[in-house]
Amino acid sequence: MELSDANLQTPTEYLKKTLDPDPAIRRPAEKFLESVEGNQNYPLLLLTLLEKSQDNVIKVCASVTFKNYIKRNWRIVEDEPNKICEADRVAIKANIVHLMLSSPEQIQKQLSDAISIIGREDFPQKWPDLLTEMVNRFQSGDFHVINGVLRTAHSLFKRYRHEFKSNELWTETKLVLDAFALPLTNLFKATIELCSTHANDASALRILFSSLILISKLFYSLNFQDLPEFFEDNMETWMNNFHTLLTLDNKLLQTDDEEEAGLLELLKSQICDNAALYAQKYDEEFQRYLPRFVTAIWNLLVTTGQEVKYDLLVSNAIQFLASVCERPHYKNLFEDQNTLTSICEKVIVPNMEFRAADEEAFEDNSEEYIRRDLEGSDIDTRRRAACDLVRGLCKFFEGPVTGIFSGYVNSMLQEYAKNPSVNWKHKDAAIYLVTSLASKAQTQKHGITQANELVNLTEFFVNHILPDLKSANVNEFPVLKADGIKYIMIFRNQVPKEHLLVSIPLLINHLQAESIVVHTYAAHALERLFTMRGPNNATLFTAAEIAPFVEILLTNLFKALTLPGSSENEYIMKAIMRSFSLLQEAIIPYIPTLITQLTQKLLAVSKNPSKPHFNHYMSEAICLSIRITCKANPAAVVNFEEALFLVFTEILQNDVQEFIPYVFQVMSLLLETHKNDIPSSYMALFPHLLQPVLWERTGNIPALVRLLQAFLERGSNTIASAAADKIPGLLGVFQKLIASKANDHQGFYLLNSIIEHMPPESVDQYRKQIFILLFQRLQNSKTTKFIKSFLVFINLYCIKYGALALQEIFDGIQPKMFGMVLEKIIIPEIQKVSGNVEKKICAVGITKLLTECPPMMDTEYTKLWTPLLQSLIGLFELPEDDTIPDEEHFIDIEDTPGYQTAFSQLAFAGKKEHDPVGQMVNNPKIHLAQSLHKLSTACPGRVPSMVSTSLNAEALQYLQGYLQAASVTLL
């Protein structure tokens, strides 16, 4: 792909088409661009378009496409081809900073993101001059350029907030601080001075305050891991200026917009974050500045309005107070009763009120409301911050705080009782205040795990929550209904079971509520209750206890999916899945109707998949339907195949990537349900499963391997007779998988199934080549994971084909190789094998080598007999060796490249653990004793002599125990 005008024209046309709303035009254009992105110069063509195109829409589109291209392809994944040639990488890094800084802001942001993606992989080792190039631009005096540098630096350095400490991180941050801290501080001071100079110039102030926000964010990132010496030495400069900015009020920077935070609010919010960071992590060094910041932030809180634009500022300011009041040596600032009352009255209660903006979100933007309220993304809301402050104050002042707030709760409930339809917000605030007060520790999985004992949660539930939920009208006071349901969710471990049981039909009833929030909360509450565990770790609620409600529960759950705004509601689908799981055979009478509804839903959502969690829970529900029904009646599998195969065919033909791994897992489950041979409908699919294109997607691999294993388990004879020409393709898949460090274990799963199930004569001609491939991989890239899998495989091979066959195949590849494998791999590494079935396979295989392999008794291999026995006793008795060499620690932790669909394991499609030696050997220790006894009868005197002279005392003692347990002796 040359950088010619003609070549620029083609991507321009296709980029235009990617913006077309018509999928018939848009998708082919997207596919075309994906198909050419592997060509050399492709990324440079996009950058050239950015520079030369006259059409601004094309420029923006090219910048987004370039960023996504970098996101998908820049990372070099081990065992995979480099997707961007080295020349293009060098050219991109040479040009991108200049291009980013000279572009308009909209494009600058995209290129800045691209730089940070490249930087995450290449900086500092492969891009050492990036920092110098950026710092030099500070001298330009052009704040468009300076802000571009700051924005890029922010996206590059913000990962320091989340990284674990390591030598590599320390080296990188030191390099960054040495190059960046002083120029950043000088820029900070210069920008503050310019703000004074241009105090009456609104447009100049807007640019300067944008810079100050980015500088403050960078301060946070650079100080997050440790307090750098430079910033400790310059704390006076930073903190004095931060304090000045916190108390600054410039009319020119105030906005009329009530929703969107202005620059002044954003800057003050970030400064509150910075002060909280220092108060929490560097309190000793920060101590002398703290009282000034507490005063400034308190004044800020009592003078800031209730408008939405101040939400982030107020929540960060409250979070600052929350972080301070939790520290033991600041508690004197809060211990006065008047101070606590004042905080409650002026900060906490006002910020717990349900505002008009919250009501609007509840009604019109329910998805976002639920995300914030249920999923904990409410980190920057006033209510969440106020709740955290209550918890912080309760750490040292639980009694006084509970007393003060109880008074507020009672007066709010009295106000509500006077006129519920007008004063319902008072009750909402009261419930929230009780929740904040009572919640000491909380997790998503278990709700409240530690509660304030001064609050009677059950009494509040009976008096103030149940009456709202018992009301006949599920659509009345929707916010209070949602509050009540959430109360059940949060305090499900504190409210007694009998009260929760009373709640279940009420929650089922609220699945019919028109409010998306209410019926979503009802579904979520039911799902959480159904997962609760009792004292014996069984589910707290039994199927028998829920039996009276089965029909109405299933009816209302599926009806809820038809309510406006909830057609792909993940909480409802998760509740369906959980109900199936809890109720088991009680759902069988309803399955014919429900599987039709699930199939129709699957067909609809597969046209345009947009809700991954919904899709996952739906697939789980389908698996549960199959499992539960076919457990009672295996012949019913045919009905499921009739219902599902048409939709599956459409998904596979349309290459719906999001659903293909699910389809393969469900098909595996269906196929495994067949007890006899493989139906012809499956065999027709078999050749297609071996197509290389399917195996190129990482997300498909585990599901495809599982499906091929099901084919091998159920139909190995059919494959050997009717599809023998496909065996090389099957082994080709194994060869591809074994070459990858990320997927080699999947290759072994497949190989083990081939060895275990295929008729020996069908794979005879390929056996030697299989071993050669494995040895090549061992030679080129030996990892702990590979060795463990290799050990299981050779022992399974030994069990299947015999110990002599294993010795002969090794020595057939290279003379004396069998001895090398024993000495260098089996004996020293067997301790690393994990998993009960895997250990059992290895134990039975090694027992065969010891007792059924003549060369082990009368050749040069005899010297390895006792060390091999010693290693087997070690496998039985010693702890597993789970040490991993340093260089391998991150070998399996690979991000899924780019936008490929990651594999999502379906729990209810799960394969039962298969034990290939289960029928042959029950107890491998007894089996070893019996096999040694048998060997000793064939060669009297030799085995006791070898054992007593070479086995260490501890191992010998264990062995004598096995012999006694088996009631045998060595002759």
From Swiss-Prot:
Superkingdom of origin: Eukaryota
InterPro entries registered for this protein in UniProt: ARM-like, ARM-type_fold, Importin-beta_N, XPO2_C, XPO2_central
Entry-linked Pfam families: CAS_CSE1, Cse1, IBN_N
Gene assigned in the entry: CSE1L
Subcellular location: Cytoplasm; Nucleus
Record bears the keyword Protein transport: yes
Domain annotation Importin N-terminal: ranges: 29-102
Family the entry assigns: Belongs to the XPO2/CSE1 family.
Function: Export receptor for importin-alpha. Mediates importin-alpha re-export from the nucleus to the cytoplasm after import substrates (cargos) have been released into the nucleoplasm. In the nucleus binds cooperatively to importin-alpha and to the GTPase Ran in its active GTP-bound form. Docking of this trimeric complex to the nuclear pore complex (NPC) is mediated through binding to nucleoporins.
Record's GO cellular component terms: cytosol; nuclear envelope
Record protein name field: Exportin-2
UniProt-recorded Gene Ontology molecular function terms: nuclear export signal receptor activity; small GTPase binding
